[in-house]
Every structure is written in C-alpha cells, then in structure tokens.
C-alpha cells in the first residue's frame, strides 16, 4: 500500500536529513512519496548517491505557516491510500520498522488514525495518549501528575490516516496555530464514527514542549485552548463515550 509522508522543518535540516535516511533504509516498502516543507529558509537537503527510494518533494514557504496549514498544503491532492504526518524529531528504532504495522492498523475497519507508542531517548514511554483537555484534566495531569485513563486524542508526532478519513475531516483546522490542531483533528475523527488505534509499533520522540520554555509559545497554546473550548467540536466531543487506553500488542 502506498503512503505519502509530510514532514515540516523549522530549521531542522539535520534532523530531517537523518529521518529521510532512516525512512529510506527501513520503510521504503511502505512509502511512495515524501513532502518536506521548509517553513523557514535553510540549506538544501543532501541527496544520497543512489537517490531516494521514494519521490521527494520540497516545498519552500515564502512566509511561515502554522502546523496545520503546512501539512494540509503538503497533503492536498494526495492520491496515495494513506497519509502520514511526521515530526522531524522522530527517530526510527534500529530493526523496528514502524510503518508496515501502522498501515495495517490504519487499514482495519473503523480506524480513522493509527499511531505508534512513543518512547524518549532512554526508552521511557511518552504520554502521547491524552484525555480531552479541560481545566480539570490539565490540573490533574500537570499539577497532580496523574496518568490519564482515556484516549480522546493523540499528539501528531506520527500519525497514519487512511486517505478517505483524512479527506472526510478535510485535514487540520487551520484556525489553530501551532497548538491543539491534533486535538481537534482527533475529536473530529471520533465524531465521524472513527477510532484512534495504537499500532504494534514504536518510535522515539523527544516530546519537547516549547510552551513551557517560551512566552510566545505559551500565548499561542493558551489561545488555541480557548479556541478549542469555545468550539462546537469540543462541545459535541464531550458527549462521546470514553475511549479506553491501549492498542496493538508490542511483543
């Protein structure tokens, strides 16, 4: 099954170069096309002597765009059966090719989005599976350090969607900027009767949160949360049945 992968670089040239080599070495059988969007000017990517085993398209923005707008533009007009949103700071584990399992999971009836388990650099499981954010849920997670029991959304570091599901929700809502696009996308998939399904796959993702380090990112995060909480999608999603934590086995 063919898949198009969208990667957005904000000056992450070295990380993108590494990721492309990992995709070429391990996942070429699953991937037919990769679109790399340079959101800011940066040096050209180096092409290996034998070329890439997939079609590589480079988009250079004249002005920076938001997370959702970049991926929507990259995946507009996709004809591949599956689309993948992939962060440049994701690493593939040695001898653990994730995309075959992600595509198989995304192919299951009723699945709107497949995702892998995310680990940090030392192998600890990252909290990519989250409850619908609310002031109370944020208090429990950030202040009380409680683990979330439900999976209402997953972060967009590595998502694989069947093309019909992506088209049905029309991609990301571009009115969000840098934060909550993934929350909104997952809620709209679930409102459409589709489920989020963890695949039996692992990737490494640092999971750095810029909103905890930079005031500008914190402001963007708060604005996006307020937009989410005032949205019709959020209001309707609050009535959805709880989605249990868990997914594909990792043997």
Q: What is the predicted role of each segment?
A:
Residues 61-78:
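Glycine-rich, basic loop-to-helix element that forms the pyrophosphate-binding segment
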Residues 83, 89:
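Short aromatic/hydrophobic "clamp" motif used to bind/position activated sugar donors
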Residues 31-41, 57-61:
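Short beta-strand/loop segment that forms part of the nucleotide-sugar
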Residues 12-27:
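Short, well-formed alpha-helical segments that are part of the catalytic scaffolds
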Residues 184-251:
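Active-site-adjacent helix/loop segment of glycosyltransferases
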Residues 132-152, 156:
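Short, flexible, basic/aromatic active-site loop/helix in glycosyltransferases
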Residues 94-126:
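Conserved donor NDP-sugar-binding/catalytic core segment of glycosyltransferases
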Residues 153-170, 174-202:
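A short, conserved alpha-helix in the catalytic core of glycosyltransferases
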